[in-house]
């Protein structure tokens, strides 16, 4: 790489790492690198977003979907600051992302120059690798190390580079590192396998809690569950690891979860945690033996007191553990859970078919599921929309579900669909958003238009921050500042050069989704829905008490008496 500029070296190395596009916004502290990207535009495409937050969210979503490094680029100062939300999303969900941040000219660093901030200090908490590049010669080595670390530690790597360094010639050979990361298979230890197998063999009511660590072990998970006669509950980021209608599947756990999952957790005599660090202790059983499988030893016992642990690669570990356990012939617990889940499906599917005005979000999601391709990518935003998609979109084994699960940042839906369409263009990319989440990033709909991405954006529009309203009410408070000024999102889409479709009636849903999903341009389907409360699968006494307090306050202060369906509430309570 001698006699090449640092910018040239960077573009070549990114290509060697398999990167074919970079998200960001051009500007004065990265102009020299932008020039190199212009030269390499046929191999390394620059995707111009309208906000750096969207660039980082898209890079994170791409990494979650493909497992490959996502790359975003910003100028110094405000541009770098804007990256943080998306980078924290990548950190929280363990997605490998590289952020390249421009910096003021090297001769001005440390002099409080225009747009100068202390980038290393700012990125310190979010990054697993964080370096400021001080010479052209060091940049190739640092870039390789940054990407390798992002992969190995499943997190964010940041390189801060002054613009003049991109144009500086590299005066020496060779490069002492190579653009390669070899992922090893961590084999489980025999003594760990024996101990875990003993607990599983002795259990009469084992239950599996599967996390996103099982995404590369779907087949192994089902084979293990069948032999252990264990029902499977999944965390939100693991949605799709098990097909929703599989007989072992009990749905999600927590606020977005199902009643069968909650009740099975209460009844189990062994908790088997696979590839998850589920944080909500209140939804896990009390004083129950637990075993945990994870590739990261620091995760074992982090959230729940485990009796035995297994540190290994998910697929390899499950295959070996399955060989060690006995086939469980007593399947009464599994059969009872399957029966309870079927009752749950029967109950919630009534909401999907009931004719109502305004529309229910459950109806919208059910019709979308019927219209979506068998290998569609669902990029789901944060809010009540997360609840409806987690419960009512019944995924198969070929579909993917991406979401900001741990940081839970609103506005992730549209960037995720953009990333999905760019990285896997042969698949349908569908963003499912609330009006609150979409409005946070709606300025980037023109990005999809500009790059001719045939994404579909479905907006569940209740003119409200529904999850926040519900949380306020459950605390016993009257909802305040949750109503949103409505926007005609279909008209907005048309003004951006996309197709806009407004839906207000049930009979309009299927034609709207068919048109959107078969279009060769971005389409926004703006669906007006009622303000349906996202009742948890199992209502706790504390939630019922808080909501009762809200109803009394609302009656005496506003002369309004509002509550969800009594029949539905009683079924969730008892």
UniProtKB/Swiss-Prot annotation:
Belongs to the TPP enzyme family. NCBIfam families: PRK08611.1. GO terms for molecular function: catalytic activity; magnesium ion binding; thiamine pyrophosphate binding. Pfam families: TPP_enzyme_C (PF02775), TPP_enzyme_M (PF00205), TPP_enzyme_N (PF02776). It comes from Bacillus subtilis (strain 168). Residues 384-464 are annotated as: Thiamine pyrophosphate binding. FAD binds at residues 256-277, 294-313. Binds 1 Mg(2+) ion per subunit. Gene3D superfamilies: 3.40.50.970, TPP-binding domain. PROSITE patterns: TPP_ENZYMES. The keyword Ribosomal protein does not apply. The gene is ydaP. Mg(2+) binds at residues 435, 462. Induction: Transcriptionally regulated by SigB. Thiamine diphosphate binds at residue 52. Its cofactor is Mg(2+); thiamine diphosphate. Disulfide bonds: none annotated. Residues 28-55 form a coiled coil. CDD domains: TPP_POX (cd02014), TPP_PYR_POX (cd07039). This is Putative thiamine pyrophosphate-containing protein YdaP. The keyword Magnesium applies. Keywords: Coiled coil, FAD, Flavoprotein, Magnesium, Metal-binding, Thiamine pyrophosphate.
